[in-house]
Amino acid sequence: MSSFFETVRKRFDKAEKRLDQFNAGPALDILGRVERLGYDVASVSGLPETRLNELLLFERATGDSVTAMALALDPDSIGCAMLGRAENVEAGNRVRGTSTVASVPVGEALLGRTVDSLGNPLDGGSKLEASPREPVDKPAPGIIERDFVNEPLYTGLAVIDAMLPLGRGQRELIIGDRETGKTAIAVDTMVNQRDSGVICVYCAVGQKLSSVTEVIDAVRRYGAPERCIFVIAAADDPPGLQWLAPYAACTMAEYFSERGKDALLVIDDLTQHAVIYRQLSLLLRNPPGREAYPGDIFYIHSRLLERAAKLGRERGGGSLTALPIAATEEGNLSGYIPTNLISITDGQIVLEPRLFHEGQKPAVNVGKSVSRVGGKSQVTAMRQAAETLRLEYAQFLELEIFTRFGGMVDERTKRIIEHGRRIRAILTQPQFAPLPMPHQVALLLALNEGMLDRLPLEKVPQLRDSLRRWFSDHGSAVFERVAVTGEVDEASRKSLRENVAKLVFELSGSATPSLAPS
C-alpha cells in the first residue's frame, strides 16, 4: 500500500512541476540566421540565449529542417556542428532554437539494437520513441558516490586475466599500431560476457562500415547480442555525429550502471575521436594548440572516461567499465593523444606489431602493459596461480634473446627457456575462444607444477581443447566450485592435478587411462 501512495505522490509532484512551467501567454519564437556554412559546420547569429550542446533546427530550402548542435558560444555568433546532411541549407536560412540539449533514448528497449549517435535505429527496426531520454553530456559520479573496484571482469584471455586483471568499474586503455588486434581484444571481452550478465555497449567512431559489420556479426554469432547495444558513427557520417557518439554510448551504458547492473563500454577509437574534434575546432576557428589539437582536448576525454566507475551501495552498487581504444604510429606511446589517454585511464594494454606478425595473438607486450587497480579484484585462485607468472615470463624473454645467436646455454637456462615457451603457448589464444576463469586456473596450476614441461610444445593448444572437453563432460563440479568460491580447495586441486596429468599423458603419445569423473 505504501508503494501505491508513493507512486501517486510522485505523479502529483510531476504534474505540479509541469503546471509551474506552463505559460498561458503568447508563444515567442526567436529565430536566428545562418551566417556561414561549410564542411558540416555553421556560424549562426541572432540566438543569444542558446546553451552549449543545445540542438538547433536549420530550415532547408525544401521546407524541412536538419539538426545541429551548438559547440562554440561567442557574443555575436554560435558555432554549430551539423548532425545531419547539410544539403539545401544556405547562408541566410532561418535557424530555430529548441531549448533542449542533445539527448538519446535509454533503457531496455535498446538492447540488441544498432543505433546512431542520436539513438535513431540503423538496423531497420522500429523507432525508440517510447523510451526515456537522458542528456549525452552528464557529470561524472563524485568521490563519495564511488566504491572500490573489487569485482573482476573477465576477458577470457589468459594473458590479461592472469597478468593484467580488470575490475568492474575500471578504465583500461587498449593501445597499439594499426592492425595489431586492438578491436579483437575488445570483441573477445564482449563475447566472454555472454554468461556474466554484463551489459555491453560498443561504440564505433569513424570506422569503416565493413569493419563495424564484422564486429556486430561476431558478437551475434559468438556472444549475447540480446544484451548488447551498438552505437555507430561511421567514417562517412557528419563529424558532429562522430564527435557525439562516445558520449551517447556512455549515457546508454550509464542507464544500467545507475540501476545496480554492470555495464561494459568499448570505444573504438578515441584517436579518431580526437582527430574529429580537431577538425571541428579548426573549422569553428578555435585557437589550435599542440599538434593543432584544441586546448581542451584532454578535458573532452577525461570528462568522458571519468563517468566509468564502480558505484557505492547508495547509488545501487552498479559499475561501468570502459575499454577505450587508441592507435599509435610506429609504436610511439609518447604522442600527444596516447599520453593523454594513458594518464586518464587506470592502465593500458599495449600491443606490438612484431609480436602480432610472429603469431603471438593477442600481441600484448607484457612489459609495457599495466593494470593499476584490477589486481585488487583478482580472485584468490587466479592470484595464487599467476603469482610468479609475470616474473617467469620476463626472465624467459630476456634469456631467449641469447639463444637466437646460437650461443651455448647450461641446463638450467634451457629449462627456463622451455618453460617460458610453454607460458607463451598458454597465453596465445585464437579469437572468439575465450577461456573461463576455472579453465585458466587449471592450465596455470599445471604449468606451475611442471606438467606442461613434459608435453611437446605443439601439443599445448590440444591440451587446452582437451581440458575444455573434460570440464564439460566430467569436471563440471570442480568448475562450479572454483567459479563460485574463487578458490581452489584441496579436493579441487587434487582432481585438477590428476586429470590434467592424464590428459598430458595421453597427448604425449602414451596409452590413455580413463578419466574419472570428479
PLM feature spans:
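N-terminal accessory targeting/assembly segments
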Residues: 1-113, 118-122
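Phosphate-interacting basic helix/loop segments used at nucleotide- and nucleic-acid interfaces
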Residues: 14-25, 155-160, 249, 304
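Active-site phosphate-binding and catalytic loops of NTP-dependent enzymes
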Residues: 20-24, 64-67, 102-106, 120-127, ...
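P-loop NTPase nucleotide-binding/switch module
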Residues: 93-95, 102, 109, 122-170, ...
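Conserved P-loop NTPase nucleotide-binding/switch module
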Residues: 178-199, 204-205, 209-211, 222-223, ...
